[in-house]
Regions:
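Cap/lid and interdomain-hinge subdomains that line or gate substrate/regulatory clefts
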Residues: 133, 137-138, 160, 167, ...
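TRNA-binding/sensing appendages of the translation machinery
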Residues: 1-84, 139
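Extended alpha-helical scaffolds
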Residues: 152-156, 165-170, 180, 194
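Structured core elements
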Residues: 42, 66, 77, 158-160, ...
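Acidic, His- and aromatic-enriched active-site or binding-groove loops in soluble protein domains
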Residues: 63-71, 175-199, 204
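Positively charged, Gly/Ser-enriched RNA/tRNA-binding surfaces
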Residues: 18, 24-36, 47-48, 83-96, ...
């Protein structure tokens, strides 16, 4: 049996009804980002491998599809994340001194899916703010992220917050290899106490105790006060907890409908984050529907270190979580060569109407569009009448 019609695992066609919903959401989110002052950029899907891996942290290379450029012989990759590309654009092509707000929307490709029911070809929408190190930029990005989920129609959203500086402060002065740090981060995120105890057995007592405490620091805003009592009074730890508390206060005031949570041990999927990180969860999805945070070091790989904060989400995932929007009713029109008919159809389309012309021989066929009106001739005029 031929398999020419089969697609690779976790790769799927997007059919008309879903494609329409994705495109409507894409336009809506880009318009929303523009209302915040964001400028649209469109990085290439294909880029030199070393550029795609710059500043992304350990473990990123395994997600990239790789190939050899037949023109130059260099290694190329299909992007798995757009953020490094936007950092390159900010650092080299725009090269501005002040605040730069950028947004993007395009496909990314993963060698492995992030979850059991996720696509290996997400349609990634994201926003980045460069040039401001203060919490004001973090708050603006989080406001924008929550607005995006609201526009998508998601209900019962929970925003989960953490900070990479907590682990940095706890591990300050402790030399760990990249592999050891990755294993430790994974154990913390999974709250695997047995593995964590094994990995920390040879560390200084104060460091070990703090690492064993981190997995228990999750819950509501009260977790921040508990963390102050139980974690070392390191400057990075104190700054992280103070910033999280400041953000929690502002978010609760502006978005009272959002549940706020904290998981101070979860950093597994935030390889290049340097400060505040956040993720959003919604009813009907076990994994986060949106991730973001601060990554001030990402531009250094391109020769220009700039404060940076942003988020990204997958439009395909969002569309799958909300009820389908009704298709806008259309106007049915006969096919004809008369100039007056063609002008009437054109005028309706210019007014924003969907006009479906019934081709000869197909008058009795149903179409996908819900036509509730038809274009008919009355005397010498073409008029729209209800069906």
């Amino acid at each position: 049996m031929s398999s020419a019609w089969l697609l690779p695992e976790h790769i799927a066609d997007v059919l008309p009804s879903q494609a329409r919903r994705i495109e409507e959401l894409r336009r809506d989110l880009l318009d929303m980002a523009r209302s915040y002052g964001c400028e649209l950029v469109i990085p290439p899907l294909l880029e030199h491998l070393d550029s795609l891996l710059s500043g992304t942290g350990a473990g990123s290379e395994i997600k990239l599809f790789k190939l050899v450029d037949q023109l130059s012989g260099r290694s190329l990759g299909l992007r798995a994340d757009t953020t490094p590309q936007v950092a390159r654009i900010d650092a080299h092509l725009l090269n501005r001194r002040g605040v730069t707000r950028l947004c993007y929307c395009g496909p990314v490709v993963h060698t492995r899916p992030d979850g059991l029911n996720t696509s290996r070809e997400p349609l990634q929408f994201g926003v980045e703010i460069y040039g401001h190190a203060g919490l004001e930029a973090d708050l603006e990005v989080q406001d924008l992220a929550l607005d995006a989920l609201r526009r998508a129609g998601l209900a019962e959203v929970m925003l989960d917050l953490g900070d990479a500086r907590l682990l940095q402060g706890v591990l300050d002065g402790v030399g760990l290899s990249a592999d050891a740090l990755a294993a430790l981060t994974a154990a913390l995120a999974a709250k695997d106490m047995a593995t964590l105890a094994h990995l920390t057995a040879d560390l200084p007592a104060g460091t070990r105790d703090a690492l064993l405490v981190l997995p228990s620091l999750y819950g509501g805003r009260e977790v921040l006060a508990e963390a102050q009592r139980r974690l070392p009074a390191h400057p990075l730890v104190k700054a992280a907890l103070a910033d999280l508390d400041w953000l929690a206060g502002h978010l609760a005031a502006v978005h009272p409908e959002i549940r706020l949570g904290f998981d101070l041990a979860d950093l597994q999927r935030y390889a290049y984050y340097t400060g505040i990180r956040f993720s959003a969860y919604a009813q009907g999805c076990a994994d986060a529907v949106l991730r973001g945070g601060r990554y001030d070091e990402i531009g250094a790989a391109f020769g220009r270190r700039r404060p940076a904060v942003g988020f990204s989400l997958d439009l395909k995932t969002l569309v799958g979580l909300v009820a389908p929007t009704p298709l806008r009713a259309a106007v049915r029109a006969p096919w004809g060569e008369e100039a007056s008919l063609r002008q009437a159809v054109r005028a309706l389309r210019e007014q924003g109407e969907t006009v479906v012309c019934v081709l000869p021989g197909h008058e009795n066929e149903a179409d996908e569009f819900d036509c509730d009106r038809e274009l008919v001739r009355e005397h010498t005029e073409w008029v729209v009448r209800a069906l």
